[in-house]
Design a protein with these regions (language model features):
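A short acidic, Gly/Pro-enriched loop at the edge of an enzyme's catalytic core
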Residues: 261-270
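Conserved SAM-binding loop of SAM-dependent methyltransferases across substrates and taxa
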Residues: 212-223
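A short glycine-rich, Lys/Arg-flanked "PGG" loop and its adjoining helix->strand segment in the class I
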Residues: 285-298
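Feature captures hydrophobic
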Residues: 2-180, 184-186, 192
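Conserved beta-strand signature within the Rossmann-like core of class I S-adenosyl-L-methionine
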Residues: 298-306
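Conserved SAM-binding loop
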Residues: 240-241
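Substrate-binding/catalytic lobe of Class I Rossmann-like enzymes that use SAM or dcSAM, i.e.
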Residues: 306-411
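Conserved class I S-adenosyl-L-methionine
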Residues: 201-211
């Protein structure tokens, strides 16, 4: 929860009523029942036997696979029962308030957990977890609220602490050299996009979902394009306008606080980097129709989006606590943008390991500023966001998450 006023907050229910560990229920003297040992073993079984062991509140260890990569400490009895009922939601809540702790590397723990769940994807238990997760809608009003929840947490006092310092890119960087700095890799990503689009001086560009506006400014400054960029986050648009004015680009970059559905005018290039995850799969044809409406006959475009290996919703905790309304599509689902509108798909690239590397940089910077972030928000917020960043990195490493860049033209 944010300690100040005026920005979005992260709502993490106090799983035990207080949001802190109940020392009595977590006491090492609290007995472990035979049923609870069985439940812990069953949880590992239903999770696909990940290389994890469970340590219960009395210190008793329930072994999982041989040579576990990490140990999950469950600090009280109620936490175990909550975890059994809905692990995809309650693990994140319990970890955030300290009632579950991980011994070992958090990313490695989550990666082996994802691989385990992936192997158990078709079991009744996994299917039930997905049924329990009800996604938010993506109407224009809902989209604005969903974006506010995640992005309007404070530009300078939060995101600037751990994103790249030049362009505030909250999307996958590009690492042609693994030893690159985050700033160099984000600049390389923007050049990679511009080269794919064959961007040249005088091109008119429509950008759907511009974040803090770094790509639009890069296109204008280094490629001579004129860019109109749309975004429904008030804080991001205000920041982007200020940066454009300070860099002398206000005459070549226009930031519009409006929904992508309302893009108007005629353009040579249509680009969207990191917005499709928020569109919702029922609206892919709408996005394609917008691109079709505004592109010239020789127009070309690029969509850059987090995706999935199989069609399913986000983990319930991410959907309800971190990224409401988000849905990463499969490659097949993304074709709904292009095929109904007669677009030709020229190139598809998967940059998932580049995103894992990007998240490694973000997580390191986030941890470097964790005490400062805790002073702004609180300890539960820090633990929740550490889990979110580590879990995202693990998802890309395990291959459950993808990063697709698709280039298209009219024909």
């Amino acid at each position: 929860m944010r300690k100040g006023k005026g920005a979005a907050t992260l709502s993490i229910p106090a799983a035990g009523g207080e949001g802190t560990l109940d020392t009595q229920s977590a006491s090492t003297t609290t007995p472990v029942l035979a049923l609870e040992r069985w439940l812990a073993r069953k949880l590992l079984e239903l999770s696909g036997h990940p290389r994890v062991s469970i340590v219960l509140w009395n210190g008793e260890e329930v072994p999982g696979a041989a040579a576990p990569l990490a140990r999950m400490h469950i600090r009280d009895r109620d936490a175990l029962y909550r975890l059994i009922r809905h692990p995809y939601l309650h693990f994140g809540d319990l970890y955030s308030v300290g009632r579950i702790e991980i011994e070992g590397d958090l990313v490695q723990f989550l990666e082996t957990a994802y691989r385990g769940f992936d192997s158990a994807r078709d079991t009744w238990f996994t299917q039930l977890q997905h049924l329990l997760n009800r996604p938010r809608a993506n109407t224009p009003a809902d989209s604005r609220e969903n974006i506010h929840h995640h992005y309007d947490l404070g530009n300078e006092e939060f995101y600037e602490l751990w994103l790249d310092r030049e362009a505030m890119q909250y999307t996958c960087a590009y690492f042609p050299d693994p030893g690159m700095t985050l700033e160099d890799a984000q600049r390389a990503k923007m050049d990679h996009v511009c080269r794919k689009l064959r961007l040249k001086p005088g091109d008119r560009v429509a950008e759907a979902g511009c974040g803090w506006g770094g790509l639009a400014r890069h296109m204008a400054r280094y490629y001579g394009a004129t860019v109109r960029a749309y975004n429904i986050s008030h804080e991001q648009v205000a920041y982007a306008r200020g940066q454009a004015a300070a860099q002398g680009l206000a005459g070549r970059v226009e930031y519009v606080e409006d929904d992508y559905r309302n893009i108007d005018g005629e353009y040579d290039v249509f680009v969207s980097v990191g917005m499709l995850e928020h569109v919702g799969r029922d609206h892919y044809r709408t996005l394609g129709a917008v691109a079709d409406r505004c592109l010239t006959e020789a127009g070309r475009g690029l969509i850059h989006s987090i995706g999935r290996d199989q069609a399913e919703r986000m983990v319930a905790w991410i959907e309800q606590r971190i990224f409401p309304g988000a849905y990463p599509p499969t490659l097949r689902e993304m074709m709904e943008i292009f095929e109904p509108n007669g677009f030709s798909v020229l190139d598809v690239e998967n940059l998932r390991l580049h995103y894992a590397k990007t998240l490694e940089h973000w997580l390191a910077r986030f941890d470097l500023h964790a005490e400062e972030i805790e002073r702004i928000f609180d300890g539960a917020f820090v633990r929740a966001w550490r889990l979110y960043l580590a879990g995202s990195q693990a998802g890309f490493l395990a291959g459950t998450l993808q990063l697709f860049q698709i280039v298209f033209t009219r024909g």
